Swiss-Prot record:
Its EC number is 3.5.1.108, 4.2.1.59. InterPro entries: FabA_FabZ, FabZ, HotDog_dom_sf, Ribosomal_Su5_D2-typ_SF, UDP-acyl_GlcNac_deAcase, UDP-acyl_GlcNac_deAcase_C, UDP-acyl_N-AcGlcN_deAcase_N. GO terms for molecular function: (3R)-hydroxyacyl-[acyl-carrier-protein] dehydratase activity; metal ion binding; UDP-3-O-acyl-N-acetylglucosamine deacetylase activity. It comes from the Bacteria. Residues 303-462 are annotated as: 3-hydroxyacyl-[acyl-carrier-protein] dehydratase. Pathway: Glycolipid biosynthesis; lipid IV(A) biosynthesis; lipid IV(A) from (3R)-3-hydroxytetradecanoyl-[acyl-carrier-protein] and UDP-N-acetyl-alpha-D-glucosamine: step 2/6. This is Bifunctional enzyme LpxC/FabZ. In the N-terminal section; belongs to the LpxC family. Its cofactor is Zn(2+). Residues 1-302 are annotated as: UDP-3-O-acyl-N-acetylglucosamine deacetylase. Pfam families: FabA (PF07977), LpxC (PF03331). GO terms for cellular component: cytoplasm; membrane. It is found in: Cytoplasm.
Length: 462
């Protein structure tokens, strides 16, 4: 199972702010596991910290703005996309201004530095949220829509459309995060010339220029008007004779604007706080609709904090009943696990089909058969025993004895016809032959039972 990661070392970048025009210093630092992304405003008294999560997004006009109390920080999306795509789970970001520097308008400078310092694996497993149902958010006014579908991986498709002679319809896609560096990271932010005056009058894009954004000239303007806009931006005047892109650097990709919109989608969804497995289809996305989806996913995560494993009954098991009997001493009527469907270095998923013929149902209870809670815990413990034995080179030589069962909770009745799916995960590394695990038992998507276990591993067989 993939572990959480943080930076091996800190790195620093310097550049001007897109909207403030300030000279900004930003430092990315390693952070403890389970801390996520945190942003520290080192220029303010007390150096307040803002959690980079979707719930803290205050504004989405021309960028994503986080706010906590009176403290805010903006233009974070390019950095967030780079951290997320390159597999950084935990990072403390120190910045001395109310926004991140725009740099070259893409995520490439962040990617380059992350690659340079490298990553270090941490102890805690990365917790993915698996999308199991269609989710959709939309905005009829802007024709924006984000659809999230179940998928084994994380993929993104983006379609953008503008009423423009230069930029009308474009598509971009990302089939795996490992392609981000090559296919998406270098795509720069963009703006239409016709929007520039309005943005300047709104006290925005003070740091914008022809090096850190694609400037799209799609409606003819008199040269004196173009000169006036150049003067307002503080950039060199430029003679423009035809519609198109007016930049100091050529397009990196033919569909660079669409790729940048995909970059923004990643950056805004990084604020979910977890990696997800699902397919995103984004139509005319923007920071507002991206944040709407991120908030919806966070709400789903909170409502389903303990998420059931994916169970496909047609899939060949990792361990069938015969292999289980080779490892566990239990036999009928006390062998309470039918198969193992998934196993990793520190977790396991097992299945128990609860039949109406179980020997305990006639007495528990007549007329209302309910699986005893203690037997649910026993079944979970047997799956946990298989997890422990799976870590050993010669598992058939060992037995597992449970020393303690703690924090047991029963959430719903288990009745004939139910299928119990157990997921157990190591809480810590096995030390001196003692293993600590947390177990969850599900019926469908519902949590039925949970408990924590301590077990002793003993070599007692030839």
């Amino acid at each position: 199972m993939q572990k959480q990661q943080t930076l091996k070392d800190k790195f620093c970048l310097q550049g001007k702010g897109l909207h403030t025009g300030l000279d900004i210093h930003i430092t990315f630092c390693p952070a403890p596991e389970e801390s996520g992304y945190k942003i520290k405003r080192v220029d303010l008294e007390g150096q307040p910290v803002i959690d980079a999560i979707a719930d803290n997004v205050h504004s989405t006009r021309r960028g994503t703005v986080l706010k906590k109390g009176e403290v805010s920080v903006s233009t974070i999306e390019h950095a967030m996309a780079a951290l997320y795509a390159l597999g950084v789970d935990n990072c403390l970001i120190e910045v001395d201004a109310p926004e991140f520097p725009i740099l070259d308008g893409s995520a490439e400078p962040y990617v380059s530095e992350i690659k340079r310092v490298g990553l270090v694996e941490q102890e805690t497993p990365r917790d993915y949220y698996i999308i199991k149902k269609r989710m959709e958010v939309s905005d009829p006014e802007s024709n924006s829509k984000l659809i999230l579908l179940p998928d084994d991986e994380f993929t993104v498709d983006v379609h953008i459309a503008f009423p423009s002679k230069v930029l009308s319809n474009q598509f971009a896609s990302l089939e795996t995060l490992s392609d981000f560096e090559e296919q998406i990271a270098g795509a720069r932010t963009f703006v239409f010339v016709r929007e520039v005056q309005m943005l300047l009058e709104a006290n925005l894009i003070k740091g914008g220029d022809l090096d850190n954004a694609l400037v799209i000239y799609d409606e003819p303007l008199a040269q004196d008007r173009l000169d006036a806009l150049s003067d307002m931006m503080g950039v060199e005047r430029k003679q423009v004779n035809e519609l198109g892109y007016i930049n100091n650097k050529p397009l990196i990709y033919d569909n660079e604007p669409a790729r940048h919109k995909l970059l923004d989608v990643l950056g805004d969804l990084a604020l979910i706080g977890k990696y997800i497995r699902g397919r995103i289809i984004a139509t005319c996305p923007g920071h507002s609709i991206n944040n709407k989806m991120a908030r919806l996913i966070r709400k789903e995560i909170k409502q389903n904090e303990a998420q059931a494993p994916v169970y496909n009954p047609n899939k060949e098991p990792i361990m069938d009943i015969n292999r289980i009997k080779e490892l566990l001493p239990h036999r009928y009527p006390f062998l309470l696990v039918d198969k193992i469907i998934e196993v990793g270095p520190d977790y396991i998923v097992g299945v128990k089909s609860v039949s109406g013929n179980e020997p305990f149902f006639p007495g528990h209870f007549p007329g209302e058969p309910v699986m005893p809670g203690v037997l649910q815990v026993e079944a979970m413990a047997q799956v946990g025993g298989l997890l422990v034995l799976n870590t050993l080179t010669e598992p058939s030589s060992y037995s597992t004895y449970f020393l303690m069962i703690d924090k047991v909770k029963f959430r719903r009745k288990v009745v004939p016809g139910d299928t119990l799916v157990f997921k157990l995960r190591m809480i810590s590394e096995i030390r001196r032959g003692v293993a600590n695990m947390r177990g969850l038992a599900f019926v469908g998507e519902q949590l039925a039972c949970e408990a924590e276990f301590m077990a002793q591993i003993i070599q007692n067989k030839e």
